[in-house]
Amino acid sequence: MIVGLGTDIVEIARIESRIPAAGDEALLTCRLAKRVLTETEFALFVGSTQPARYLAKRFAAKEAAAKALGTGIGRGVSFQHIEISNNDNGAPQVVFTDGASERLSQLGGVKAHLSIADEQHYATATVILES
């Protein structure tokens, strides 16, 4: 049974405008990335050949996950409580910790499905939570 559904779309240029353009070292100072990404995700962001696209997709996925939880970001759920990674086949997956994990339990959720897509100007994500 579906216990939560969330979707989000992000304009990649908007994210790109918030990323320092002075090279790889400047990525280490990106405040938006530090606020949104976990340590593991941040390391991948810094090493990415397309950091704005990477951050936009992670931002959309985390917003979609928070919407599926019914809280959005805030009210006990932060960006740091939601981690986006890839399974062995390369498919995106979402892991909930702390407040996000507690909210998932309150909903009776046991499985999260995540789809991320991007094209030239936009990144989008959808999360479905199942009991």
Swiss-Prot record:
Mg(2+) binds at residues 8, 63. GO terms for biological process: fatty acid biosynthetic process. Its cofactor is Mg(2+). Its EC number is 2.7.8.7. It is found in: Cytoplasm. The keyword Transferase applies. Belongs to the P-Pant transferase superfamily. AcpS family. It comes from the Bacteria. The gene is acpS. GO terms for cellular component: cytoplasm. Transfers the 4'-phosphopantetheine moiety from coenzyme A to a Ser of acyl-carrier-protein. Keywords: Cytoplasm, Fatty acid biosynthesis, Fatty acid metabolism, Lipid biosynthesis, Lipid metabolism, Magnesium, Metal-binding, Transferase. This is Holo-[acyl-carrier-protein] synthase. It catalyses: apo-[ACP] + CoA = holo-[ACP] + adenosine 3',5'-bisphosphate + H(+). HAMAP family: AcpS. GO terms for molecular function: holo-[acyl-carrier-protein] synthase activity; magnesium ion binding. Pfam families: ACPS. NCBIfam families: acpS, pantethn_trn.
